[in-house]
């Protein structure tokens, strides 16, 4: 929950930071900015000003997307996506049975119950991913 609140507050801060100068500039200053842009265009060659991207010539709006580990959570149940998928498959498929057959083992018919977990690559080895 803390990560979610932190991400939302950071996104709001960036959003307000991007739009605060555009709302705070008075009309008189906007004319000065346009005059400065015209002066800059006259100093630069026509080719450079035509080939420059729009963000250099005039300010354009930008969309900032923030990713959070909470995005993998289901909002209804609060479960991660891979656990939700295992729960939707049914309780009989959530656990798998493995039988190991070994000739020298004392009891070769012991069944081992393993949970289906998501695997993440850590270095060169796949290890189970734990929830944060």
From Swiss-Prot:
**InterPro entries to which the protein is assigned, alphabetical:** Prepro-melanin_conc_hormone
The UniProt record lists the keyword Transmembrane:
no
Any single GO CC term annotated in Swiss-Prot or TrEMBL for this entry = synapse
Gene Ontology molecular function, alphabetical: melanin-concentrating hormone activity; type 1 melanin-concentrating hormone receptor binding
Domain of life, source organism: Eukaryota
Q: In which tissues is it expressed?
A: Pituitary gland. Produced in neurons of lateral basal hypothalamus which project both to the brain and to the neural lobe of the pituitary gland from where MCH is released.
| Transmembrane segments annotated in the record for this chain | none
Residues spanning the signal sequence: 1-24
Coiled coil location: none
What are the GO BP annotations of this UniProt entry? chemical synaptic transmission; neuropeptide signaling pathway
Name the family.
Belongs to the melanin-concentrating hormone family.
Which purpose does this protein serve, as stated in its record?
Answer: Plays a role in skin pigmentation by antagonizing the action of melanotropin alpha. Induces melanin concentration within the melanophores. May participate in the control of the hypothalamo-pituitary adrenal gland axis by inhibiting the release of ACTH.
Q: What is the name of this protein? A: Pro-MCH 1
Organism annotation: Oncorhynchus keta (Chum salmon)
- Name the gene: mch1
């Amino acid at each position: 929950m803390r990560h979610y609140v932190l991400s939302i507050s950071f996104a709001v801060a960036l959003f307000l930071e991007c739009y605060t100068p555009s709302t705070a500039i008075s009309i008189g200053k906007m004319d000065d900015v346009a005059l400065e842009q015209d002066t800059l265009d006259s100093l630069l060659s026509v080719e450079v000003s035509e080939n420059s991207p729009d963000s250099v010539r005039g300010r354009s709006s930008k969309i900032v997307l923030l990713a959070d580990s909470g995005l993998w959570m289901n909002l209804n149940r609060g479960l991660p996506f891979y656990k939700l998928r295992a729960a939707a498959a049914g309780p009989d498929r959530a656990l798998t049975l493995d039988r190991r057959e070994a000739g020298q083992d004392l009891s070769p018919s012991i069944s081992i119950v393993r949970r289906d977990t998501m695997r993440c690559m850590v270095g060169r080895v796949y290890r189970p991913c734990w929830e944060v």
